[in-house]
C-alpha cells in the first residue's frame, strides 16, 4: 500500500509512483488515495467488489504502545525478538508474543470446536505445509496432506499391480502395520506413535472415500505452489459434508519475501502469484456456493523499513495484511495507516522508518474467532492477552472487518476474566 504521502521526498524511499499503482475505488482511512502494486490486479478486483479488506499497521503486541516515548521507556512489555524471523513467525501463529509458546491460535480454536465435526479421527486443522505451530492445540494437532491429494494417492502407496505377487505383498504390508499400531505399548513414545498412527489410518480411509466425490471445477487454479495449495483446499471444501466437517482451518505457506536486495524484481515476481491464487480461490468458493462461509487471511512475521538499504528493505515491525471472503466488510482499509515519514513521527522507532503496530494480532484474531463461532466466554483461552486491548461488547467488534449478520452472540455471553501470562 502507498498513500499520497509516500510520494513526497522520494530520495530514500521505496515507493511506486502514483502512475504505477493500481488504484482503489473507496477508502475508510484518513488519507485520500491508496493503491497496490500492478501485479495485484486480482486483489484490486476483489477489493473493489467488496470481497477483500486490508488491515493497516498490524503486528505482535503484548500491550498497547502509544508512541516512541513509551517504547523507549522500558515500562512496556515487548514481544520477544521483534526483528527475528523465527520469533515473529511463531508469535504471529500463537499471538502470545511474550513467550515462545508451542500452541497456536488455530489450535486453541480447534480445541474448543473440533467436537462439532462428525469424524473425530480427522482433525479440523488441515495443513498443506506440514507441521506448524498455528494449528497445534492442547488436544488437537494438524492433519497434513499434499496439494496433489486425490482418492488414489491418500494413505499407503500400494506396490504396483505389475509386480509379481503385488496383492499378497500389499496385504502383508497392511497387516504388518495393523499389528504394529494395535500393540499395547507401555513406553510413552511408542504408545503416542501408535495412537497417532491409528488415527491417521482411520482418517485416510475416510478421506479416500470422500475424495472420490470431488466435483469438476470451472475455476482454473494457477500452476504455482500457492495456486495448487489453494486448489487442493477448494477440493477438500467440496467434500466437507462427506468428511462431516462443520468447522475447518487450513494452513498454507509461501516464502521468498525477505528482500534485503532485489526488492523491485522480487515483488514483481511474487505478488502476481499471490493475487492470481487468491482470486482463483475466492472464485472457487463462489462456485461451491460457500463464499460467505470461507474467510481467507494472510499473516507474516513483520513489515519492512520504508527506506532503502540501497538494494532492498530491512526488518521492521507493524505491517499490512489482507482478509478475503463473502462475509468480509470489504472495499475498506481498517486500522491506522501510519504517516510515511521518518521524522517527527511518534509511531516511528527507527531512522529507517519502522512503525509501532496500531492494531494487535489479538484484536485481529478476536474478530475472526467470533465470526468462526468461538464464544466470547472462550476468547481468553484462545487469546490470553486480549483483555489488554479489547473488552467484548456485541455492538463494538474488535476491529469491524467481519460481517456478523446471522450470528447469535449477545451481551449476555460475556467473556471470562482474562489471565495474561
Model-predicted regions and their roles:
Residues 1-276, 280-287, 307, 332-421:
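Feature for exported/extracytoplasmic and membrane-associated proteins, marking the mature portion
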Residues 278, 285-310:
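Metal-dependent active-site segment of extracytoplasmic phospho-/sulfohydrolases and closely related
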Amino acid at each position: 500500500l502507498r498513500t499520497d504521502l509516500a510520494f513526497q521526498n522520494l530520495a530514500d524511499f521505496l515507493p511506486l509512483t502514483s502512475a504505477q499503482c493500481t488504484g482503489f475505488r473507496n477508502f475508510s482511512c484518513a488519507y485520500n488515495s491508496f493503491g497496490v502494486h500492478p501485479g495485484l490486479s486480482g486483489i484490486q478486483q476483489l477489493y473493489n467488489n467488496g470481497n477483500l479488506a486490508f488491515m493497516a499497521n498490524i503486528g505482535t503486541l503484548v500491550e498497547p504502545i502509544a508512541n516512541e516515548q513509551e517504547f523507549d521507556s522500558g515500562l512496556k512489555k515487548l514481544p520477544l525478538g521483534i526483528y527475528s524471523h523465527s520469533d515473529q513467525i511463531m508469535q504471529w501463529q500463537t499471538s502470545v508474543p511474550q513467550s515462545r509458546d508451542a500452541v497456536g491460535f488455530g489450535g486453541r480454536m480447534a480445541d474448543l470446536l473440533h467436537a462439532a465435526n462428525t469424524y473425530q479421527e480427522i482433525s479440523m486443522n488441515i495443513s498443506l505445509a506440514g507441521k506448524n505451530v498455528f494449528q497445534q492445540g492442547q488436544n488437537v494437532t494438524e492433519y497434513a496432506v499434499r496439494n496433489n491429494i486425490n482418492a488414489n494417492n491418500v494413505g499407503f502407496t500400494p506396490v504396483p499391480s505389475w509386480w509379481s505377487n503385488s496383492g499378497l505383498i500389499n496385504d502383508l504390508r497392511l497387516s504388518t502395520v495393523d499389528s504394529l499400531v494395535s500393540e499395547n505399548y507401555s513406553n510413552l513414545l511408542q504408545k503416542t506413535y501408535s495412537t497417532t498412527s491409528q488415527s491417521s489410518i482411520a482418517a485416510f480411509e475416510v478421506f479416500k472415500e470422500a475424495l472420490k466425490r470431488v466435483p469438476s471445477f470451472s475455476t482454473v487454479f494457477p500452476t504455482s505452489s500457492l495456486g495448487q495449495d489453494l486448489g487442493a483446499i477448494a477440493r477438500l471444501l467440496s467434500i466437507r459434508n462427506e468428511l462431516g466437517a462443520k468447522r475447518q482451518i487450513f494452513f498454507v505457506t509461501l516464502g521468498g519475501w525477505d528482500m534485503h536486495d532485489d526488492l523491485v524484481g522480487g515483488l514483481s515476481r511474487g505478488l502476481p502469484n499471490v493475487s492470481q491464487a487468491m482470486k482463483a480461490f475466492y472464485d472457487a468458493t463462489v462456485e461451491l456456493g460457500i463464499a460467505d462461509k470461507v474467510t481467507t487471511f494472510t499473516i507474516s512475521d513483520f513489515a519492512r523499513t520504508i527506506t532503502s538499504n540501497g538494494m532492498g528493505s530491512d526488518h521492521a515491525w507493524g505491517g499490512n495484511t489482507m482478509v478475503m471472503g463473502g462475509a468480509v466488510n470489504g472495499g475498506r482499509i481498517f486500522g491506522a495507516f501510519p504517516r510515511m515519514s521518518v521524522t517527527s513521527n511518534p509511531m516511528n522507532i527507527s531512522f529507517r522508518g519502522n512503525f509501532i503496530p496500531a492494531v494487535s494480532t489479538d484484536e485481529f484474531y478476536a474478530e475472526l474467532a467470533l465470526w468462526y463461532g468461538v464464544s466470547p466466554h472462550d476468547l481468553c483461552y484462545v487469546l490470553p492477552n486480549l483483555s489488554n486491548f479489547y473488552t467484548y461488547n456485541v455492538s463494538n467488534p474488535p476491529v469491524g472487518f467481519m460481517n456478523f449478520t446471522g450470528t447469535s452472540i449477545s451481551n449476555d455471553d460475556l467473556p471470562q476474566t482474562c489471565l495474561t501470562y
